[in-house]
């Protein structure tokens, strides 16, 4: 019997649960750094990618099928939707589709190609606020006004944040850190796959 290219119901549930674990880890990792904008931008996304690399490897080895890559960013994006960050949710949904396309045509057979969606997910996590300010600045100002600020104060508040979130050097550092740590996490997951997961029958 030919194996389906798409997730079965059981595999869907497995991926869904592991994706929820990834999202939870991503949120928990950020909490200790919440008071420090620099650490939230430069360290937290990469640290989440480092830890979640192990979970990600479990997902792609247990369920290397169409749908798995969509679920991971989609679940994380839903958190942002529920907290009111609609634009960040949209970014993650676009990434969910892109990650699926990246893995089509035998992507799961390539160790290098398999690492790309994981790195992109946590790089986007680092860029959520940056992209929102860059693409939807006027909407952000309007949201501040809706909360009771006058237009001038709202514009000044956004401008003060832009100096940090949109600085080219800060963007480069955040992307590089997220990518590097995510790849290290993926490599760690692959190492654990051979030493622990396969012998234990987990993957």
Question: Each predicted region: which residue ranges?
Answer:
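Hydrophobic transmembrane alpha-helices
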Residues: 2-71
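Hydrophobic alpha-helical transmembrane segments
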Residues: 12-17, 46-47, 69-74, 89-90, ...
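Membrane-embedded alpha-helical hairpins and interfacial helices in multi-pass inner-membrane proteins
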Residues: 118-194
């Amino acid at each position: 019997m030919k194996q389906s290219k798409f997730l079965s119901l059981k595999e869907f549930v497995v991926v869904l649960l592991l994706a929820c674990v990834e999202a939870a880890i991503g949120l928990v990792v950020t909490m200790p750094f919440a008071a420090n904008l620099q650490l939230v931008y430069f360290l937290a996304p990469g640290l989440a990618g480092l830890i979640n690399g192990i979970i990600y490897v479990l997902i792609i080895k247990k369920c290397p099928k169409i749908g798995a890559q969509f679920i991971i960013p989609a679940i994380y994006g839903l958190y942002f939707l529920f907290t009111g960050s609609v634009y960040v949710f949209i970014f993650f949904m676009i990434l969910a589709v892109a990650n699926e396309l990246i893995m089509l045509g035998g992507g799961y057979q390539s160790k290098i190609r398999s690492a790309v969606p994981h790195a992109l997910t946590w790089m986007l996590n680092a860029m959520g606020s940056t992209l929102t300010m860059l693409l939807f600045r006027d909407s952000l100002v309007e949201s501040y006004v809706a909360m009771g600020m006058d237009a001038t104060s709202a514009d000044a508040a956004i401008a003060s944040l832009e100096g940090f979130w949109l600085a080219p050097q800060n963007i480069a550092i955040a992307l590089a850190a997220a990518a590097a740590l995510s790849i290290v996490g993926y490599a760690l997951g692959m190492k654990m796959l051979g030493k622990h997961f396969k012998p234990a029958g987990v993957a």
